[in-house]
Amino acid sequence: MAGAGSWLYLTAGLLVVALPQLSHSCPSRCLCFRTTVRCMHLMLESVPAVPPHTTILDLRFNRIKDIQTGAFKHLKNLNTLLLNNNQIKRIPSEAFKDLENLKYLYLYKNEIQSIDRQAFKGLASLEQLYLHFNQIETLEPESFNYLPKLERLFLHNNRITHLVPGTFSQLESMKRLRLDSNALHCDCEILWLADLLKIYSESGNAQAAATCEYPRRLQGRSVSTITPSELNCERPRITSEPQDVDVTFGNTVYFTCRAEGNPKPEIIWLRNNNELSMKDDSRLNLLNDGTLMIQNTKETDQGIYQCMAKNVAGEVKTHEVTLRYYGTPATPTFVIQPQNTEVLVGESVTLECSATGQPHPRVTWTRGDRTPLPSDPRINITPSGGLYIQNVNQDDAGEYTCFATNSVETIHSTAYIIVQAVPQFTVVPQDRNVFEGHTVDFHCEAQGNPKPVIAWTKGGNQLSVDRRHQVLSSGTLRILRVALHDQGQYECQAVNIVGSKSTAAQLIVQTRVTPVFATVPNDMTVEVGTDVQIPCSSQGDPLPIITWNKDGIQVTESGKFHISPHGYLAIRDAGLADQGRYECVARNPIGYSSVSMVLSVLVPEVSRTGDPFVATSIIEAIATVDRAINSTRTHLFDSRPRSPGDLLALFRYPRDPYTVEQARAAEIFERTLQLIQDHVQSGLMVDLNGTSYHYNDLVSPQYLNMIANLSGCATHRRINNCSNMCFHQKYRTHDGTCNNLQHPMWGASLTAFERLLKSVYENGFNLPRGISGRIYNGFPLPLPRLVSTTLIGTHTITPDEQFTHMLMQWGQFLDHDLDSTVVALSQARFSDGQDCSVVCTNDAPCFPIMVPPNDPRVRNNARCMSMVRSSPVCGSGMTSLLMNSVYPREQMNQLTSYIDASNVYGSSDHESNEIRDSASHRGLLKQGIVQRSGKPLLPFATGPPTECMRDENESPIPCFLAGDHRANEQLGLTSMHTLWFREHNRIATELLRLNPHWDGDTIYHETRKIVGAQMQHITYSHWLPKIFGDVGMKMLGEYKSYDPNVNAGILNEFATAAFRFGHTLINPILYRLDEKFEPIPQGHVPLHRAFFSPFRIVNEGGIDPLLRGLIGVAAKMRVTSQLLNTELTEKLFSMAHAVALDLAALNVQRGRDHGIPPYHDFRVFCNLSTVQTFDDLRNEIKNPDVREKLKRLYGSPLNIDLFPALMVEDLIPGSRLGPTLMCLLTTQFRNIRDGDRFWYENPGVFTAAQLTQIKQTSLARVLCDNGDNITKVQHDLFRVAEFPHGYVSCKNIAKMDLRVWQDCCEDCRTRGQFSTFSNHFRGKRSTEHSYKEDNKEPSSLLNQSVNTTCNTEQPKNLPHVNDFKEFVLDMQKTITGLRKQIKKLESRLSNTDCTDETGESHSTKEKWNKDACTKCECYNGHITCFVKSCPPVNCSRPQRIEGVCCPVCTDDKIQST
């Protein structure tokens, strides 16, 4: 016992010793061990203070009733807290704050009745919470919101009857939940718990227990098995809805909302789609019946209100209502602004927009360009102002603007709808079959949003990485120099973020096989009148196409020529005109080969079938032609024009008598042969237009010469004299002769048009295609009027975004400098003198345009539009220039073919004399009345009534007189003529000021030369680049030099079809604008009222309004479906009670009149692909509707007329031309430039300084200098500019400085006399060097004086009469001395030998060495010596050796040896 007592005592002692060490941290009577504090059964009434490092705190079995705030402060390390078996009644908010690491909390077997909302806030690590065996009746919905890691929650054996939805919704880590042994009422409000328990059960991650206590029928049922049908739950339904309210400041607003449902719905109010919080604003009250009461209303209360009724079975909303607040007027402000929104195709989208203001603003929507929304049932505006679009498509993408408008102001906000779409192919690649070495393009384009990226693969694999495979920015795959291994399938993929699409095409590569001739032609000689077949065939892969050329001009299918499928050329009725060199050309995509032969035609001396009828026929032809011409003259000039046909004939009637006589002679010649044909036909009883008749058998060559003499053809041949080189080296002739000294008639006026291809006539000579109803390639040719109405005419006009109407006007003005076809002088048929417009038959010279049945524009049952054929050239149609053979009909160009300002000066001496002011001797052109601006108009034409006086009700003012007879055709053209006539007089006046010693002729010709150069520069440097674009300018090429082998003559195809493309640029209205570029009071002029109306210039403001209209208004864009406006096709030269003409139909008919080959032949000439079907045209005419129209009209692509086909070709990018038209125009303009000896860039035409100044000129400068009062223009008159920003003052437009034309000479007394050009001026009265029209001497005398010196001088000062005797003596002495000198010169000239400076004589052609370095030669009395040039020496001391010209390096040679 003693030992035991000692042990106890020791233990007690140790305890006593240890306790003092822990007394400052361990609560009294508690047991503390390390971090565990146990205070059980101590009757504690509050939580004691414990050490901060405590991890386990056991407070069980005490009498704790309340948990004080901060009771567990600083216990951040606490892991387990045991508070069970106490007397706690309430868990206050944030009772366990700072216990962030607490995992286990025991609160069971207390007396807990309530738990505040945020009681467990801060317990982020809590995993287990035990609250069972308490007296809890309700739980706040946020009680367990802050327990993310809670896995176990025990609430069984409490008094819980209802649970608020969402009570456990935040417990994401829950694994076990116990709610059993509660008095749960299983009604509709507990369905949320049933759903939660089912989720726990299905997932298997958590266990839960909850049973129903009430109603009795469900007692003991697991809550998870309860269904809504068992509880009779009902979704809310609205029984009373709110209405819009208008309120003023301070009033009270009531919004009524009543709803029924099971359980009773909760009423929630929304404002502008946001829930209203009644607690945040004491003015807001929710009454028991759901009514929203707003007291003391303020401006901020206005907006969109909506009531929502909600219970566990669902929710429902009322319609939106508006509270409008009316206080002080206030500008609108946006409550909700639209936002950029992305949407997929096919889905719906809403752009929200609402606004407030006083009064309440009205909300409207537009597209971004302020255009109204389309009327589309898919598009609606919501009651709140939002824009709602259903089933969105790609067109809905773009900018939308919301406008909020009240009486104070309008505000707007913009947003974009971005429609995202899966890529869709717009262009898919086509299978290609090409030859190796060629380049192939696979076109592939797609659309989508975002814009898809194009990628290419071959056979599913990446393309070869080499420079031959290129993917262009457009998506096109280009393979250069195709090789055999490139063959295969190529896939195009279009990819964007929404999706991708793929398509494929095959490439087949063929080996190259160039054409090889299988049959070659040989030279042939045949008799006149026989049919000839020239063999030629070729092989190759692909099969070559055979074409034939005669003397460099391509042969086309016609009544004269036929090319068989094998390539054989058949020539019908061979004549002398057919002999020459023929070339057979075999062409395929790989290359071409050619072979040629010579055809000779013999003319036997035998009589012909028509010889007996020559005499009577020529007499009858002269009588009938003269009768018809005189009848036409009387009809046209003795009265006012009665019809559009009269008007057309009158303004195109030649003014030059020589032209009239030449045309008359040609008509008589052709009429004579026609009469002979008629006589022969009546005897043979055969159809002369048939294939069985041979024209070369008609008349013998000697009779053809007789007909030529009697008709006047031989009489009116021009004999050109180009011997006056003092003139021809410096200036042009008016008629264009002697420009090309090797070929004086090339490019001259009144000569035949040139041709690229042989003419096509039905009979091979003069009968137009389609005139006899013949079938071509299985189809008849359509009526030209039908072509116009079906294909060409348009009411719709698309403005050109780049170029002004001046682009058209310069083209017309230029055309009138290049070509004008001489038409028949008679408007009546030769056979009986009846008017062509009345009889409507194709009897010479009538060629009417027949009107289809039911044409909408025909009046008075008219059957045709009047038209006569172009006059033939003497020597064509029936005869050659030798007058002994039959040649195809050719037409006559009345103008020079050069750009020489002939539209200003005329194309003949007769015309130039009419418009020159010869009386003033100042080199001016005649001028008319002077306007208020101080600037003159053109002079009026004199003579009989003109086309400008067709309507006496408008004005009696006659036509203006200018260099071209068409100057009055329309007001814009007349304005251009006025500009350039003033430009001539302006330059001439300045040149006279600079060179007062020049005479009138010199000033005139120098000015004419400058004006022509200005027009050349404007055309090629400013105008053509707009028409041709970069592609065409490269085809045209740079100017190199004058080429005398280039014929600058105008091509028939150019004048008759190609250059008429300008008709597609014409607007239907001529605009007239004032200084502010606003319409003038008299208004604009419809085009059909602008024809032949000079009175509008005289009486209605001059030329300035018209010029501003040309530079200030866009031209008409050439669109394949919008070609010629109806002012040209329906109202051309319209007059009352008459059928107006149709320009498009005239163009088609004129092409057939001139024998222009079909479009297909020009495709071959221009190296485009041949076509067999209309789909073969798809590369040049992409519009399928246009191709279908062509098919309906022509039946075969081989029949299409040239003019309409050129007009419907798609434009080459950057140009205003299609590919064939580009080919024809570049060919013509290259010839015009390169074949002109006086081209302004040709060295020697102008000095370098003068050329520099000419290149300063511009149409803008001409407009500034010569308009009535134009002060502002754009730099480039051809480009569209916005007024006034795109315009500049005329002061800023570069000028041409004429001072470089000033003579700098010591003795200017005779310099500048027209007869003293350059250093070879002549005396004023020197006949041998006079200008042609001043020279009265016979040409024979002129020819004898060609070697006479051009320089003669007059005495400087004549002596006074008193000194006359001395003067005579001096003159006699001078004459005697001159005679001696002349005799010496004559003796020297008569001797062809030479005498050198030493006096030694040498015979002609003798050569001798004057010294070692000089060799001389005698030739025709002149000695010419040549001095040898020595190379540089490479030694320090070169040596000269006698007899050797050049020094040698002797030292070097010695050293080297």
Swiss-Prot record:
What residues does Ca(2+) bind to? D817, T896, Y898, D900, S902
The Swiss-Prot or TrEMBL record lists the needed cofactor(s) as: Ca(2+); heme b
**GO molecular function terms attached to this record:** heme binding; lactoperoxidase activity; metal ion binding; oxidoreductase activity, acting on peroxide as acceptor
EC category: oxidoreductase
Domain spans labelled VWFC? 1392-1450
Active-site residues? H816
Site positions (Transition state stabilizer) are: R966
* Reaction(s) the record says it catalyses: L-lysyl-[collagen] + L-methionyl-[collagen] + H2O2 = [collagen]-L-lysyl-N-S-L-methionyl-[collagen] + 2 H2O + H(+); bromide + H2O2 = hypobromite + H2O; L-lysyl-[collagen] + L-methionyl-[collagen] + hypobromite = [collagen]-L-lysyl-N-S-L-methionyl-[collagen] + bromide + H2O + H(+); L-tyrosyl-[protein] + bromide + H2O2 + H(+) = 3-bromo-L-tyrosyl-[protein] + 2 H2O
Question: Does the keyword GTP-binding feature in the UniProt annotation?
Answer: no
State the protein's purpose: Catalyzes the two-electron oxidation of bromide by hydrogen peroxide and generates hypobromite as a reactive intermediate which mediates the formation of sulfilimine cross-links between methionine and hydroxylysine residues within an uncross-linked collagen IV/COL4A1 NC1 hexamer and participates to the basement membrane integrity. Moreover brominates alpha2 collagen IV chain/COL4A2 and leads to bromine enrichment of the basement membranes.
- What name does this protein carry? Peroxidasin
| Species the sequence originates in | Xenopus tropicalis
- What is the name of the gene encoding this protein? pxdn
